[in-house]
Amino acid sequence: MACNFRKSNLVEIPDMFFGPEQILDGGPWYAETHITDNLIVEPWNAFSSLAIAAPAVYFLWKIRKEPTQYAFLLACIPFLFLNGLGSTLFHGLRTSRIFLLMDFMPALILTLLITVYFWAKALPKWWMGILAVTPVFLMRFGIIDLIPGQGGINASYTISGIAFLAPLFLILRKYDFKKSFNIIGGSICFILAIYFRQIDKQAVDIIPFGTHFLWHIFSGIGAFLLADYLYFLRNQELRPSKREIA
């Protein structure tokens, strides 16, 4: 896999992630990107990123009395919050590759964790989940290298989405399809999020600052629905004889 590195004083980042459309901070141009002396470079993209961090704050508050009982959800919360915070700083300032890493690395790790978790729930042995997920994530990096720019990034998100949604039918069936709305609604939100991410620059005639901010908003809604489903699953394990009705 071809992978050239660009150096900065802070960190080395491979070109394979970004393609030819990046600017000085290593990230791509968006419809809203206008490098000026303004304090906030991309206000819509920056403030909408808070929608990603919001579910992390909500569920941290929700499990505050018994956090250790919800160990997996608790482990996911920092990555979700860092993703939202990193996206806010990245889009707002466009000055640091550290913020760029915070924009996508927590999401990458979080997607991997949840995908392995769902496959481990669906398959007889937990290690089978790791075996099922590994080639998918190798494919994700491969497609970013094959398709430059935003197209490759969007394709990688699509692959990740399919990977962690695939085992959910077995999990839904196990719990009599309770909370199906979370999975259906979350899937629709993630599909819409990727769609709006893809058409960001094509939609400027309708929305002058593009549609990337809708990627953040629908991702935040989808993250909330998914976190709520993780909360539900854990409650089923804690109270197997008194399963909650969706």
Map each language-model feature to its residues:
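Multi-pass alpha-helical transmembrane bundles in non-GPCR membrane proteins
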Residues: 5, 9-246
